[in-house]
């Protein structure tokens, strides 16, 4: 079955809508402009735009999470943003359920949804169909774990579930606590409880990247812009409303500003510290996407599974014609058959010409 293009826009027959239009994922490390490119593509395709950033699901955490601004959200509906209060622990299983339901709804309407974000586990929960442990939050256990220093919690996670710890930043208190909850509740590492059930619809994963020196410059510019927009005031307000021990306030950027407000970091050191730690986080994201999503350097990579195909490739986030590069890949992917007889090895290197 091939998808026809009408004026460059895919048109699926009603009988095919449960198998096609599939899913487009725009992923990559922080500060690569994923949200902007996803917005442009969503407007061009008429697609639902779904957030896959684990902090943007929370209300009130706006500036420090690089959440699309109200003006940007007014240009096109952004979904799975601002859906829970900061005091609620939103699990990967909850995200997966919400995302899968919205994707299924989009497919019934003949639409190709776009999933955008940098939280690898959120993305993998959808693209690989991970079986996420259904472990509800444990308030009493969490209160006990929150009394431990963050570095002790993370070190303990490294002992109990080293695989999960590899993919969690040492300063990510939310995910560290969640992984420990699962270990203590089930007696097994969270990483050992996940079983993949890949979806049968086609998936296109577009990873945005640039060399680390340029990415660090982008991180520095964005951090300065966040400060100018009132990030410190945002943190002050959140600390007054929820208290300084809120787990989300221990995450990247918010924790450093909290330390500054408490007099533990000089003002002159605050912004460089956030930039340095964000760069470290971006390197971990790159490692994760290369290893877990199969996005390889410099070429397209295809894997075939059942009725569906997952294709992933990197694009330079600073390319002047990036929107057109993305559009070229989307059109080629949509025009390709949804079933093929060749092996993954045979498919590699010839699915696209990036």
UniProtKB/Swiss-Prot annotation:
The Gene Ontology biological process annotation of the record reads:
tRNA modification
| Residues at the site labelled Interaction with substrate tRNA | 119
User: Which Gene3D superfamilies does the protein's record reference?
Assistant: 1.10.20.140, P-loop containing nucleotide triphosphate hydrolases (3.40.50.300)
Task: Kindly indicate whether the keyword Transferase belongs to this entry.
Answer: yes
Q: Where does substrate bind?
A: 30-35
The keyword Magnesium belongs to this UniProt entry's keyword annotation: yes
GO molecular function terms noted in the UniProt entry:
ATP binding; tRNA dimethylallyltransferase activity
Annotated residues for binding of ATP: 28-35
Needed co-factor(s):
Mg(2+)
Q: Where is the signal peptide?
A: none
Which segments carry the region annotation Interaction with substrate tRNA? 53-56
Recite the UniProt keywords alphabetically: ATP-binding, Magnesium, Nucleotide-binding, Transferase, tRNA processing
Q: EC number(s) on record? A: 2.5.1.75
The EC class name is transferase
Reactions catalysed according to its record: adenosine(37) in tRNA + dimethylallyl diphosphate = N(6)-dimethylallyladenosine(37) in tRNA + diphosphate
Q: How does it assemble?
A: Monomer.
**Which PANTHER family does this UniProt record tie to the protein?**
TRNA DIMETHYLALLYLTRANSFERASE
Q: Which NCBIfam families match?
A: miaA
Biological role stated in the UniProt entry: Catalyzes the transfer of a dimethylallyl group onto the adenine at position 37 in tRNAs that read codons beginning with uridine, leading to the formation of N6-(dimethylallyl)adenosine (i(6)A).
Q: Report the family membership.
A: Belongs to the IPP transferase family.
- Its recorded name reads tRNA dimethylallyltransferase
Organism (species): Synechococcus sp. (strain JA-2-3B'a(2-13)) (Cyanobacteria bacterium Yellowstone B-Prime)
Q: Which gene encodes it?
A: miaA
